[in-house]
Amino acid sequence: NFIQKTFSLQNDRTGGGKEFWFMTRTDGFAAFAYRMTQKQSTEKRFEQGELRSEFALMFVKMAQLPHKGKFVYADPFAGHGSIPKVLSEECSGCTIYASDIDNDLVGKMAQKFNGNRMIRVRQSDATNLSFFKDNSVDCVISDPPWGDFEKEIDIPLLYKKMLVEFDRILKDEGKLCILTGAKNHFEQAVKENKTFSKNSQNPDFKTDVLVNGKKASIYLLKK
């Protein structure tokens, strides 16, 4: 059938472990979906604030980045490295800069990606990415702090300052892809930024999602 041919799967009535859902509404809307089920407890497999691997994959897919080419991608809030890992798997030939201000996380990423020639790990403040030249990055894709765990961080100020720095390092027409639950703060920062404010009227500017049960949004912007 369609699912078997499209996804190269075999039917297993005893419990194949994969679920496909087809849902319809009375207003005519229909959706065909794959359920990304994880049987193990996520508390045991993920650190606090770590982005789940399947969500990181969806995030990267939504960014619509080329699968091949000598592009430069940056995750300035790389944390545990979920996004850089997916980028290295989905985009062959690119160079990925995974940076974070936390020295401990940077050390763990350096070990995790040891031997991965595509990923370069740096310790850096996302508002001062001094290792990048102006107009040198094709896409910044990141999951910055939302303010849930980092109570000492001024989130509105952080978002404003990071957008200024992203504007500096991105090439003309470069992409900015952000995941955040602090939606009001980010949208206000975009509104106040001369370069990125034009994006707020685009139909794909904002996509609402749930991350571990929390409301968030994925934002797609261009310089």
Regions found by a protein language model. Give the residues of each.
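Class I S-adenosyl-L-methionine-dependent methyltransferase catalytic core
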Residues: 2-223
